[in-house]
Amino acid sequence: MTSSAMQQLYQQIILDHAKSAHGAVAELSELDEDAAAVAAGLRQAQSHQVNTTCGDEITVRVGLSGAGVDARIDGFAWRGVGCSISMASASVLNDTVRGTSVAESLVMLDLFREMLRSRGTIEPDEEVLGDAAAFAGVSKYPARVKCAMLPWVAFEAVLLQLS
C-alpha cells in the first residue's frame, strides 16, 4: 500500500472512531463505581485529565480482574469533550486494551507514546497497536500530540492507582 493510501486509511479510522466512539458513556454517573462489578471481583478506579493547551477533558474508568501485571482489563468506559483526535484516541484505546493484561497494555502504551513523540521518524507497529497506529501522522504536529495522548495518560494514571 502506498504511503498516501495508508494516510487516507489512517484518517478514515480516526474519523470513524470520532463519529462512533467505542466505550463512551453519555453521563458521567455511568462511570460511578459499579457495585455488580465490585461484587464480581473487579477493582475499579478512574482518572480525569485535562489538556490545558486546548481544553479537551476526559475521564477514564477501568475495571481490573486479577492482580499485578497479569490482571486483565475487563472494564473500560470513558466520558470526554474535545477534538476529534482526543475522542477518537479514547475510542481506539478502549478497543485496544479491553481484554488485555496490564503488562500487554503497558507495552501498547509505551509504543503509542514513543510513536507520537517521534515526529514521524518511527513507523508504527500495527501488529501491536492495531488501530492506534492510525495516529502516527499526528506525531508531525506537536500541538496535537497532547490531544492524542490525553486518554492514554488518563489510562496510565488509572493503572498506577490500581497497582
Predicted regions and their residues:
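Basic/polar, acidic-poor N-terminal "presequence/leader" segments
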Residues: 1-13, 60-62, 71-76, 81
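C-terminal binding/interaction regions
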Residues: 1-28, 36-38, 100-163
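Short, surface-exposed loop/turn motifs that are enriched in glycine and acidic residues
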Residues: 4, 48, 79-83, 95-98
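Structured beta-strand/loop patches that form or line metal/cofactor-binding pockets in enzymes
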Residues: 20-77
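A short glycine/serine-rich beta->alpha loop
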Residues: 47-48, 75-82, 134-143
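Short, thiol/selenol-centered motifs that function as redox-active sites or metal-ligating centers
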Residues: 54, 80-87
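Catalytic-loop motifs flanking and including active-site residues across diverse enzymes
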Residues: 85-89, 147-150
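Alpha-helical support elements that line or immediately flank enzyme active sites
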Residues: 89-101
